[in-house]
Amino acid sequence: MDLTQLSCEDFLGRLASKAPAPGGGGAAALVGAAGVALGNMVGNLTTGKKKYAAVEEEILALNARAETLRKRLEALVQADADAFTPLAAAYGLPRETPEQQARKAAVLAEALDGACAVPLDIMDACCEGIRLAADYAEKGSVLAVSDAGCAALFCKAALQASALNVAINTKLMTDRAHAAALDEKAARMLAEYLPLADEVYQSVASRLRA
């Protein structure tokens, strides 16, 4: 089942259920995609307007990036579910003999690495989403500036949520050096892009209250 083909109602129903997927990872990807779509909306409300003719080409370029990014995040909704399947299977492997224990450890290590790869990819996409939101807030239609702020906040939330999904998997890794490297990769993205998202929000909020 392709989770992205579900209606909003069905997706949320499955999210609330005991079903193994979607979970926090897929939900984060969807929230990130929604944030990027909001930014793209700002761009589409800006193009074709005489007032913004000077930035028309820049906005069109942003829109092209946003559309590609949204589709990437949509695909990551399903990718997260697909990554959970081998992880669940690995936990179910027998470990009664030394050979079984060794095999389970190897399979689990590979599955945990795969389960980290998707949220790290979501984080990377959300970082780009925050950059786009910053550009839309600066150059897009003032009538939709609140949506640019929302775009930044959605991508920020998805970024932080995905960092938690990295952490829950690295916590279980026996290769602590590898786990630390993945945690550091996530931490670098948080350190760089959370302040940018907050800056976009504060800028938009100040403009709306002026």
What residues fall within each predicted segment?
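Short, hydrophobic/aliphatic alpha-helical segments
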Residues: 3-21
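Amphipathic, well-ordered alpha-helical segments in soluble domains
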Residues: 11, 34-41, 83, 122-132, ...
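Conserved phosphate/anionic-ligand binding catalytic regions in large, soluble enzymes, centered on
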Residues: 17-40, 144-162
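Amphipathic alpha-helix face/heptad-repeat signature
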Residues: 30-34, 62, 69-76, 115-125, ...
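Transmembrane signal-anchor/signal-peptide helices with a preference for the extracytoplasmic
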Residues: 41-53
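A structural-propensity feature for long, helix-poor, extended segments
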Residues: 50-89, 189, 196
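Amphipathic alpha-helical interface segments
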Residues: 80, 84-153, 157
